[in-house]
């Protein structure tokens, strides 16, 4: 019974989150063969200003 955590920036629509979850379930099923009915996906949404890429706050030009 796989549990997959996915941390994302807040703001995706319910439709996009649903598609993301479906894609994660599909890839997990294809990769390890688990029955899609037992694959669990947990989405964690974070404010963009709490996320960093390469040492820069998401959306900022200068490092913090």
Indicate residue ranges for each PLM-predicted region.
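A domain-level signal for the structural core that forms small-molecule/cofactor-binding pockets
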Residues: 2-64
